[in-house]
């Protein structure tokens, strides 16, 4: 799967989703080719932005604290994806639509891509712009979760897929807020 197909996956149930159904990637492949490299992006941007103009975001935090927060953020991000996959897997069983863990991991690996890419906005030292892009990325992540749940888990009802995507995104939002708190408090 190419990241170039990501925009169409936000708005369509086909495109990249059909490719993932036709040629399902292994968990190791998704982790190595999507999760690991893209998880490095927010940590690197926190390291850069915090070291250069961290006072714009949180006054009084030293560059060394930003650098430590970036490392903690990376570890937390890498741990969050398998936890989210487990949550999707558990949710699929609760609504009586059991899914393979591999499909759940694929959704958990693809859904945060907009959030990871949104870290590039940290090149702009403006908290309002960063927040606006973060909200847009969150909306795209919700759309990817919904379309991924509906398509990869072969859901038959829109409402159940939306319900599951909302629960998973809510948990993901909570995890994201915890990660942001790690960055801001550390």
Regions found by a protein language model. Give the residues of each.
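Alpha-helical transmembrane segments of multi-pass integral membrane proteins
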Residues: 36-45, 111, 169-176
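Juxtamembrane transmembrane-helix termini
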Residues: 18, 52-55, 96, 147-157, ...
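Hydrophobic alpha-helical membrane-associated segments
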Residues: 79-83, 137, 141, 178
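Short alpha-helical linear motifs
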Residues: 30, 54-58, 127-133, 158-160, ...
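Selected alpha-helical membrane-embedding segments in polytopic membrane proteins
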Residues: 2-99
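Juxtamembrane boundary at the C-terminal end of a transmembrane helix
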Residues: 174-186
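Hydrophobic alpha-helical transmembrane segments and adjacent short intramembrane/lumenal linkers
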Residues: 89, 98-170, 174
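Helix-loop junctions at the membrane-solvent interface of multi-pass transporters
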Residues: 48, 52, 124-125, 182
């Amino acid at each position: 799967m190419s990241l170039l197909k990501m925009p169409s996956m936000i708005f369509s149930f086909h495109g990249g989703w059909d490719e993932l159904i036709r040629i399902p990637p292994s968990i190791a492949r998704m982790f190595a080719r999507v999760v690991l490299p893209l998880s490095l992006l927010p940590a690197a941007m926190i390291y850069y932005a915090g070291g250069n103009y961290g006072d714009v975001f949180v006054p009084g935090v030293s560059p060394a604290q930003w650098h430590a927060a970036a490392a903690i953020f990376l570890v937390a991000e890498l741990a969050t994806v398998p936890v989210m996959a487990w949550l999707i897997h558990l949710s699929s069983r609760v609504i009586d639509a059991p899914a393979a863990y591999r499909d759940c991991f694929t959704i958990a690996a693809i859904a945060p891509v907009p959030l990871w890419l949104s870290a590039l906005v940290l090149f702009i030292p403006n908290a309002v712009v960063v927040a606006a892009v973060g909200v847009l990325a969150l909306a795209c992540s919700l759309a990817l979760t919904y379309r991924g749940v509906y398509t990869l888990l072969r859901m038959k009802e829109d409402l159940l897929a939306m319900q599951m995507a909302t629960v998973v995104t809510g948990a993901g939002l909570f995890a994201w807020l915890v990660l942001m708190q790690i960055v801001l408090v550390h």
